[in-house]
């Protein structure tokens, strides 16, 4: 590390100048990789480990990081600190070796908190919408010339990265409640998009515990900070009297401080008016579909308005918003073989949503923008515990599509739970009599099993948080045409 780099480090986090080499266990995850990318650009020596290469590790390698595709004790040699993902178990060889060598082992959010410590932090939390809202806030600040640093849980498509080092005082970050580690953060502004029961193993199955944790997160704001909260959400409305900080509310509700009105969706764009107290109305064209994205935009506008950002910059950023990876991600429209003598096409959309509320929002956006298309969903449930806990909600939401193909549950390290598997979920949906789901036990057969379902005027939603995104990209590569010998590597 040269003198110029050290000077830059001192100007950002003065006491972290003692740190030279930062090692990340699980560096290929979007959240971990984003922080590693910012630190690499700040001049730190970065290394990390994961099980396989991916776009995140490729980007980090291009920045000079050393990536190991294994977990071995020697990987942490000479590290000043080890940053660990919540997905990594305590008996990981690198974690054990770090403890034995008396190297500090910290969670991802603790490192993010250090990045935020000497900046104007804007943290975006909530069960749904965090990634997109983070990208919207970042886009507005960038359009206004404020050059923010951002760390996001998904790819910000306009920038082509999950994270970017800016040169201003602003740091915009997604705040993760899944392991309660967002309590490490001490932002100046916090957005809470909504609060629902998810990741309940972290909260010992106690929803009151989850709600109190969000309150504790908001109490990390200084008394002169601001909480921006969606008043449409019944849990947030219930918690507002307990926040104890300055608040700005947003939503479709008439009592919202920033109110969405006259929403209309035309294809992939939303058109609506934002009413702000004491400010001119904003007539917004948002390049993202769905009422849920109008709410995300309202949150971003509330923050930008409080900062004094020019309305023209806000409107330009939202109209040109390119979205985030795997959030209603349009992968193409492909010609199909003629059906009943008529040629047709199918649109392919990839979406990360894996909670019933998220899936419902995606379906509604698809119906609103393309009402005449047959809606075909390829769904992969994520985690047996989530499938068990939200079983009826999944069954209710998934019956809204015209045709459903379902992959096996993506376990994310969990053991199977009887009755919380895809076969059982398909049976429950079938018994309701609205649609007849197709169980796809072999991912390599997706294109073959999808073909007879298509009519030539279709919108295919590939939905889920596991490896189903790889299948979506594979379907795009082969233009939805079944291959004679479909490769299994995409599954």
Curated annotation (Swiss-Prot):
* Transmembrane regions listed in the UniProt entry: none
Q: What is its main location?
A: cytoplasm
One Gene Ontology MF term: ATP binding
Query: A Gene Ontology biological process annotation?
Result: peptidoglycan biosynthetic process
Keywords of this entry? ATP-binding, Cell cycle, Cell division, Cell shape, Cell wall biogenesis/degradation, Cytoplasm, Ligase, Nucleotide-binding, Peptidoglycan synthesis
Annotated EC:
6.3.2.8
Query: Mind telling me which GO cellular component terms the entry cites?
Result: cytoplasm
List the InterPro entries. Answer: Mur-like_cat_sf, Mur_ligase_C, Mur_ligase_C_dom_sf, Mur_ligase_cen, Mur_ligase_N, MurCDEF_pg_biosynth, UDP-N-AcMur_Ala_ligase_MurC
Its annotated function is as follows: Cell wall formation.
What family does this belong to?
Belongs to the MurCDEF family.
**Protein name in the entry:** UDP-N-acetylmuramate--L-alanine ligase
Organism the protein comes from: Salmonella paratyphi C (strain RKS4594)
Taxon lineage: Bacteria, Pseudomonadati, Pseudomonadota, Gammaproteobacteria, Enterobacterales
